[in-house]
Amino acid sequence: SAARGRFEAALVAQSEVELGLPCDVRDYTDFYTSVHHATTIGKQFRPDNPLLPNYKWVPIGYHGRASSILPSGASFRRPRGQTKAPDAAVPALTACARLDYELELGMIVGQGNTLGDPVDMAQAEDHVFGIALFNDWSARDIQGWEYQPLGPFLSKNFASTLSPWIVTMEALAPFRSPFLRPAEDPHPLPYLDSAQNRAQGAIDIELEVWLQTAQMRKNGHAGERLSCANYKDAYW
């Protein structure tokens, strides 16, 4: 019909659309919630002491750079920074040779709080609109040299990619599960604990990372799975 023709003329194929960010990101904090990831990365830099003693007591995080958050699929320049080989006398300025991905979930905070006024754990989720996939790209060779003693800087400020799609907390309700820790580990301090969080603080969803190169796409190859995890295993 004529009406259908006008309707179809207004549609654009999803494969031809370049999606943007789902929200205006004013600020973001990156938390280190996977104890397995923290231990693995710690072994690279501190083989004898991979997991620092504060990890199981306080959520570890750092303030990221909101101005370099890009939508998933966006291109960005490979970062440059100082690196130092173990046998080198001085560091060198080079392009990153160990660019790494990080499978993360972005918690979209829609409601703020008054400066200096803490949010109680029991009301914390009232401030969360939903979640989206997030990739905090990391230059591991630059990070290994620059992170001492205050943590990463140029190795993590060049690009982070956020999915254009947000899944609301209401849609995640069927996937909620109890927040659990190993019996031998310490319980969170009272201000980091609540009955509601213990009852359904975890989200039971499977997460995967797949690699699909340009050549794979050209050949119709679906890609290769690099890693998988379940968000209910997050330590915080």
Predicted regions and their residues:
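Extended C-terminal subregions enriched in glycine
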Residues: A234-W236
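Active-site microenvironments in enzyme catalytic cores
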Residues: S1-C228
